[in-house]
């Protein structure tokens, strides 16, 4: 914090830096319901949608994001139908996309006082962290995003070095939520 009197003007400035590092060290191994059923879990889904979820698991962090992905072949390449026109979502295959928490936040606040009048302003920065845009996924599904237009003009979406119809590709990934990986920023 800095305070300075500049004649009739009083200036106050604050700079705040914060960082949060966390790690899930231990989770409850099992618990017993009132009806006697024992529940065991090694992870806990904290929320999500069709193709995106936040998961707590030992060794991970609060804010870890997992996204659904596309079906792959035995070599790990994205599976394309024999006709070359479709891809398919992978059933219950989730990959780590990143963490929603910022690496750090920074704020700088200034206030000027003069004859009973006060003027203040603040700059904030949230640096790092992964976000997921379900709006981007929906726009891709309906074919109204810039990248769907580009792929339509280029003859289709490029998958494994070959073009497949953009409509088929984006309706598969956008409708399934698999597009969340493409909509991460």
Q: What does each model-found stretch correspond to?
A:
Residues 116-121:
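Repeated loop/turn-to-beta-strand initiation elements of outer-membrane beta-barrel proteins
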Residues 16-20, 113, 124-126:
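Outer-membrane beta-barrel pore domains and translocons
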Residues 30, 124-127, 132-139:
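Short Gly/aromatic-enriched secondary-structure transition segments
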Residues 7, 113-115:
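Short strand-coil-strand connectors
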Residues 2-100, 138-185:
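Conserved small-residue
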């Amino acid at each position: 914090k800095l305070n300075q009197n500049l004649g009739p003007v009083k200036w106050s400035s604050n700079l705040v830096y914060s960082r949060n590092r966390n790690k899930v060290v231990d989770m409850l191994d099992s618990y017993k319901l009132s009806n006697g059923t024992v529940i065991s879990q090694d992870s806990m889904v904290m929320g999500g949608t069709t193709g995106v979820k936040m998961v707590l698991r030992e060794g991970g962090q609060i804010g870890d994001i997992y996204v659904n992905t596309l079906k792959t072949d035995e070599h790990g390449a994205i599976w394309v139908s024999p006709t070359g026109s479709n891809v398919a979502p992978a059933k219950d295959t989730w990959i780590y996309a990143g963490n929603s928490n910022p690496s750090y936040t920074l704020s700088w606040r200034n206030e000027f006082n003069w004859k009973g009048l006060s003027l203040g302003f603040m700059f904030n920065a949230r640096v790092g962290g992964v976000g997921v845009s379900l709006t981007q996924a929906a726009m891709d599904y309906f074919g109204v995003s810039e990248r769907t237009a580009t792929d339509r003009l280029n003859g289709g979406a490029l998958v494994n070095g070959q073009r497949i119809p953009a409509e088929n590709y984006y309706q598969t990934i956008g409708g399934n939520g698999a597009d969340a990986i493409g909509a991460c920023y």
